[in-house]
């Protein structure tokens, strides 16, 4: 990320003066896909790509925002109830509203931002943007009184309330809590977390952009979540203590099979197995067993392709190609 580039665009677009610069990273998730909104475990890590924003209070009640990458400009009043039409501006609008709900006296500001997280590549450019502005508003207007846990929730609430995505907490948590050289095992129910050093000596983690873009709000994301909730509802008939798929065993799922559609059963089966895979990978990492880590990653891709059905031809091809070449991991959805 180039701070000077963002600064030069800010100076050019606004009044020739400078403001404060804030940045947050994107993320990868080594394993634990679609487990976060089921109360399970995930295993993300921050990356060296992210979002940078320059921000300067403007003495009004209006936010003036410029997307450098999209060359688009939006203004909105902080008292407005309706979010801007531009999808990117909804993230900034949502963060402002959510911070105000938490008692931060947000005032108008000028801002320009840019990033080097590939958009739509599953590396959480939106969470990086939300975290950047949550940090900024907390610093500029909130005396940093909002803690990091709550800043992550600000981003999640922004997705829920202003962007139409009923997401879990993983993306925002990884952006806020990410630490160089480590992955984070996050319990998405309790928000307890543990850092695991990641130093795959003898191996290299390769990130490949399939160039297939995804849009969570317009994809099957919300439908998958509904399938998980339907499976939980069926299991609850005999096990009322169950709240999320995190609480369900394969035995309990099999017991309720007659009340679950074939499609919903497959979705739930994948999630239950994936939650266990995260724990298995953490155990393997502590032993330095990267062969097992790679095997579990391959199992994850197979499950996402055949059970959760969120892969695509391009990713399946990349996964098979890597496997044929002797690699130990899998293509990342």
What would you call each of these model-derived segments?
Residues 1-27, 52-85, 182-329:
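C-terminal nucleotide
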């Amino acid at each position: 990320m180039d701070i000077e580039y963002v600064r030069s665009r800010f100076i050019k677009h606004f009044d020739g003066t400078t403001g404060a610069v804030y940045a947050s990273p994107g993320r990868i998730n080594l394993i634990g896909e679609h487990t976060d909104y089921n109360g399970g475990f995930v295993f993300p890590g921050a990356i060296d790509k992210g979002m940078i924003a320059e921000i300067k209070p403007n003495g009004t009640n209006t936010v003036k925002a410029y997307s450098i990458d999209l060359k688009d400009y939006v203004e909105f009043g902080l008292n407005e109830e309706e979010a801007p039409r531009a999808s990117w501006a909804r993230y900034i609008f949502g963060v402002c509203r959510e911070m105000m709900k938490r008692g931060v006296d947000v005032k108008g500001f000028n801002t320009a931002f840019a990033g080097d997280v590939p958009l739509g590549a599953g590396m959480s450019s939106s969470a990086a943007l939300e975290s950047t502005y949550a940090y900024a508003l907390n610093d500029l207007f909130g005396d940093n009184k909002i803690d990091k846990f709550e800043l992550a929730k600000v981003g999640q609430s922004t997705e829920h309330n202003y962007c139409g995505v009923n997401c879990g907490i993983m993306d925002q948590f990884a952006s806020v809590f990410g630490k160089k050289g480590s992955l984070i095992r996050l319990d998405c129910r309790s928000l307890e977390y543990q850092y695991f050093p990641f130093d795959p000596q003898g191996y290299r983690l390769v990130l490949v952009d399939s160039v297939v873009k995804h849009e969570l709000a317009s994809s099957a994301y919300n439908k998958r979540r509904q399938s998980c909730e339907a499976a939980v509802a069926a299991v609850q008939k005999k096990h009322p203590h169950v709240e999320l798929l995190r609480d369900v065993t394969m035995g309990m799922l099999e017991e309720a099979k007659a009340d679950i559609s074939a499609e919903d059963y497959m979705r739930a089966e994948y999630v239950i197995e994936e939650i266990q895979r995260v724990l298995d990978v953490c155990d393997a990492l502590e032993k330095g067993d990267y062969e097992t880590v790679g095997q579990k990653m391959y199992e994850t891709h197979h499950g996402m392709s055949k059970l959760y059905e969120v892969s695509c031809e391009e990713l399946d091809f990349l996964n098979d190609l890597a496997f044929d070449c002797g690699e130990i991991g899998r293509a990342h959805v």
